Amino acid sequence: TITVSVAAGTNHTAPANKTCSVEVTLPTKVLNDNSWATIREVSSAGLGANYWTVGDVKSIVLNGTVRNYTFNNLTVNAFILGFNHNSAKEGANKIHFQIGKIGSTAVALCDSNYSNTGDGFRMNTSQTNSGGWNASHMRKTVLGNSNTPTSPLANSLMAALPADLRAVMQPVTKYTDNTANGGGNVQTYVT
């Protein structure tokens, strides 16, 4: 609480004292102790590297069905890959995270259908890489990249992420070969 006092005089119409409630959120050096909103504020200010280091983790809890697999309160760590990586192309003031540790062990999220060509955690639903990463089943359907974090595709990994994390996600441009099928190193294939 802050109280502002006005000096005596007649050149104002303000009350002699005014009390205001103020809420201050200060980031801590322990990444996991911060809310995703606080992490986003620090990131947007370009100060992430002043508080945290590459490898620091923040626990998230996955809940929901992703394709045919149901996550039920699975705690997984998101960890910092870097700060302002490739900022000239991807934008400044970003903290880059990767999901995939339980404790300190790297894990891959996958279902029992990975060896089938059905609707599981697969790159594509047929034995092809046609369309490259941009049109892949993994990107559009499993990960849910065909919608936005605040309105995720149903039954996608994006929808299984905590809402407070999805609320602060920022778009980042990643350059990938979106044509596939062995087209070679051709500049126009990269988008």
Predicted segments, located by residue:
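Extracellular/surface recognition and adhesion modules
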Residues: 1-4, 20-22, 80
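N-terminal non-cleavable signal-anchor helices
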Residues: 5-7, 23-25, 173
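C-terminal edge beta-strand
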Residues: 16-26
